Amino acid sequence: MNSSVDSTVEPAVRQDRWRPLRYALRTPLLILQALISGPLALLALNPIAARIGSGESTFEKRMIRWWSGALLRRFGLRIRRFGEPLPGAVLYVANHISWLDIVLIHSQRPVSFVAKSEIARWPFVGWLASRAGTIFHRRGSTDSLAVVMATVVDRLKAGTPVGVFPEGGSGHGDKVGTFHARIFQTALDANVPVQPVALRYGRDGRQDPSVPFGRKEGFFPNFLRVLGNPSMDAEVHFLEPVAATPDARRRMAEQSRERIVRELGYGD
């Protein structure tokens, strides 16, 4: 176990006597999904299949939702949705806890996410993100951010929903960080609504501390820990939209964060 993982998490993981059994049960199912459903999903995402159906019921989008939900179940996660995602072009803004966040939202509605470029190299998640039209950016690059902002506006104007994590990085699930306001300008430029989305992984309305990344923890150690975790809920709350206020993107960011904090029951 990575020594950088929270000190309250590592002892609990070591003392979990059922963890080997969960690995034994879930790993074959995970491999099966990669071997069978992966190629099926790839077939569904080709240009011809993408034209089957219309709106949110295209074969492509249904396959993304199914594949994402199946992947979460491989990790023992029970999806619990509250509220409804807005239809059409929307800027979804969510708190960021885990690499699972993109998969969880995709299980409800496929969207083009803005995500760090490293995710493209991650197994399962990277493939899903790339096929679903994720907009990758290089952290710390002003040029990359400008391109990302322009791409987001173009996608929104074309009717494609976009998802962002305005905190700028994942947290530990015990609080919601400050939302950076700049990304909210894309909703103003494209004249689309902003819908806050609250995410949580745990039981009885409490965030499980073993799901978020530990300090300096890499993807694979976290992936393995989550794979062996006891079953828990994966909550996705679609909240009341935030009114688009010209020249007030900071207020839009604050209101979005406030609604997520209130929904999750965190102190500000």
Predicted feature residues:
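Soluble, non-transmembrane catalytic domains of enzymes that act on hydrophobic metabolites at membranes
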Residues: M1-R14, W67-F82, L100-I102, T178-R182, ...
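A transmembrane-helix-recognition feature enriched in membrane-embedded lipid enzymes
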Residues: A12-R80, W127-R131
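A conditional alpha-helix N-cap/helix-loop micro-motif detector
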Residues: K61, N95, E118, T142-L145, ...
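Generic beta-sheet signal
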Residues: A89-A94, K116, H137, T160-F165, V197-L199
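Membrane-embedded segments
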Residues: I97-L156, T160
